[in-house]
Amino acid sequence: MKVGFLVSSVSREAGGLFESVRGLAKAVTCASASARVFGISDEQSAVDLQDWQPLSVETFQPQFRAWGYSNQLAPAMLGADLDILSTHGLWKYCSVASQRWHRRTGRPYIMHPEGMLESWALRNAGWKKRFAALLYEDRHLRSAACLRALCEAEAQSIRSYGMRNPICVIPNGVDLADLSETPKLQAHAFADDRKILLYLGRLHPKKNLANLIRAWKQTPDSHRGDWVLAIAGWDQAGYEHELKQLTRDYGFTDSVQFLGPLFGQDKDAAYGVCHALILPSLSEGLPITVLEAWASAKPVLMTRECNLPEGFAVGAALQIGTAPEEIAAGLKQLIEMSDDDRRAVGDRGRTLVATKFSWPRIGEQMRSVYEWILGGGTTPESVRL
């Protein structure tokens, strides 16, 4: 079975999709399928292509970068003799290329909205998305043989958007971290013995980091004096400047530190040295950063909008709200826990990843959906008709 993976970027420019699509393609390959990856090149592609090895990856120069348009993309897909196509993300030229491939070959594709049909995401730059939906995206969604949701909440969002296709509910995955290795955060070593509360991801308003900093302000000095809030990520639309100004206004130049974007070994080291992860998001699909923290046996503070209720159910995460006072309550709970209790929360997260979010398990689930689409037979357990 030849599976194509189509994504607008194969580099860190794709954000969380860089990890999730790469992991899924490798997992599907391990589950007795061959994978070919197609994407648009960008400034980081040459650096990050090595992370896709041993997969076959083809990138193409864009003529219209903002939309991800390349006139070489669709012909390359048509020449690849794929059995099925896996398309990731919305609102870009990839959606048009996917439909063109489908019409020309008569072969099916699975559409992965990647959380982009959540209500908050649809409202963000809403008029542009409504125009794209009318022009091509709704047709692209309706024509998919199956839509993949990362969680039950996303499946409900897809139905609320009006799609009636079959939906497979299959989460993202991660690999378990090697806890025997001593982490070394080379570029951002902390010189003192304070505990580290890590945020890792895009610096974007939907991540709700301004309210996190306001919550840090509400936390008494006696609680946060032994901690540092480390914010790691890449700026979007100037949000980093707003956050840094807020920390200066509060006098937090020491207890709140901005690490910049972390990838590869630096990112792994950040998970290794931190004592907990926080994700106060207003909207998510299924955040891979939480899974990565659990894979490193770290406790997590997160909102219910992160769509990982399993973490709350097994005691691997502390639930926080999105308002500053609600986040502050979670910070107080975390800080007042003993080291042993925090470790126990992280250990439960690692066990959860091993049992539900491992890539081998997810690769098998996805392969069963491919086989069902191509050959019929028994409906996989993950599919909602």
Which ranges hold each PLM region?
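Glycosyltransferase donor-sugar binding loop
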Residues: 39-44, 174, 200, 228-244, ...
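Short hydrophobic beta-strand element within catalytic cores of glycosyltransferases
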Residues: 299-303
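Aromatic "clamp/platform" in nucleotide-sugar-dependent glycosyltransferases that forms part
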Residues: 282
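Carbohydrate-associated surface elements
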Residues: 153, 173
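Membrane-proximal helix-turn-helix segments that form the acceptor-binding/catalytic region
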Residues: 104, 130-146
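A short, well-ordered alpha-helix in the C-terminal region of glycosyltransferases
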Residues: 341-356, 368
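Conserved donor-binding/catalytic core segment of Leloir-type glycosyltransferases
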Residues: 2, 148, 189-207, 213-216, ...
